Amino acid sequence: MELKKAVIGPGAKVPHLTYVGDATVGAGANIGAGTIFANYDGVGKNHTTVGQHAFVGSSTVLVAPVELGDGAYTAAGSVITNEVPAGDLGIARGRQHNSDGWVARNRRGTRSADAAQRDRSDDRRLEILTLGSRTA
C-alpha cells in the first residue's frame, strides 16, 4: 500500500497493492486490493473522497476528482470517473469480447500461438469424439 496526502478514517481497510493519493477515505470503508486512486491528470493533482462504509471492489481505478457517497459500492475492475451517490453501485467496465483466432493471426510462430494451436486441436478432437458417440 502506498499513501500520499491521504486521510484514512478509523476502521477503514486499505490492503496491499493499493495506491491512495490525494484522498479522504471514510470510517469503515473497505478498499479492495489493487485499487488505484488516479489523482494526477497531467496538469495537477485532484482529490477523491470515499464515504463512510463504502466498498471499493478489487482493481478499481478511481479517476479524480471523484466522490463515492456513504455506503456506495463499486464493482471490481471498474474505472470510476463520475460520482457514485450514497447507497449506489458504480459499474464502469467494458464488456468482454474475445477475438477468435487473434493469436494465430497476429503472433504466428510464438510459443503462445503453438500452445493455442495444440489446445484448439485437442478441443476439436474431443468435440468430434463427443459428437460421434451421440450418433452411435
What are these regions (language model features)?
Residues 1-132:
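Glycine-rich hexapeptide-repeat left-handed beta-helix
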